[in-house]
């Protein structure tokens, strides 16, 4: 009798996004950068559509536009041609190249291809000797008309491996940040002022001494948060009088002002010169409870000895208190009065709204670090998290959730690497009052008949997802009001009487 194959159910309504999307978002947080996907045109189109739908901002993501023949013969020539085109048309300071499933599967050596491209193209002195395309084993060279001099200031090119089958968008986001740190930061003492010389050799005349940010600045890497969160963090650090490098910073490049003319590369982003000096900061603060062991912060610590402090996302009172205490220690200043007052108002609001929230039950889903932060906050305000779920699979979620609910709420059911089919199946017999997560849970919310509190990414069915503030006392206040009013509205709508006073 033959052995039956194991039963298998494909992913149904995934609770995660693909790895190159996260890398594209991270690269967009660098000043003058253009994200570039080495793969098929469809990958870049999908990323653009998804990001635009949430941020309501245009975003260009370049592509090497591989087709069927490149899956057989390789995409080297397309990558080189694409890099040259982006450099000529956009004049970027940096190009962030992220791989896709296709190029990882066929085995393209992206680092080698980029190295060849620099030798062939940079400073416009050497024509590209790479193969333009391949057909039946026959090679074709680039025509002279296709070879133009690139920018006078050749862009940095950062590469990162991000096949979708190896992780989620959050892993791609962190992988891109780590790649930038490893490939762009430079030793203290002398920092290169130019990008490349003809022989890629720098002399003392090409450099300048590190001064302004050396051992005085703080590296702050908050992870994947909203544009409003990034602006808030910059305000906090400024109010503490701290010189800082916030990386990545897409608070303006993905949530900018209305302009008369469309810029090819929007303003905003972490300045490249600041990134180059990150290894010589006073300390690195990295936010996240489920970060990879090998992160950008650990890379800086290993490469330059930069002290690393890790903390959870500052959502709610306890986690924000931890961050404020650390900033007090670093700045040697007391917490500014505006944040002390905001904390007091939040506590007062929690007392006022406790009668509406006590004992309510919630399902929280989304990115692992956000789920941990939201679970901590819900436990603080008297709501019992029943299920905490994520499409990520760091292996750290269960312990992180246990840490934040200890002493406040029973340990919820915690699930990693799940989709919405799994979440619905586990929640079928449970009595819940609210869902907390992104828009992809709306179908479940409608089916279950419970309201959805929209947070995180993506938010496609409401406007202003990029402006939702989650962090700090101010963010907690906004979340508290939204949750409380949603529960009141649900009770009001369900009442046959229609009370106007609750």
Residue locations for each model-derived region?
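An N-terminal assembly and electron-transfer interface module characteristic of large anaerobic redox
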Residues: 1-502
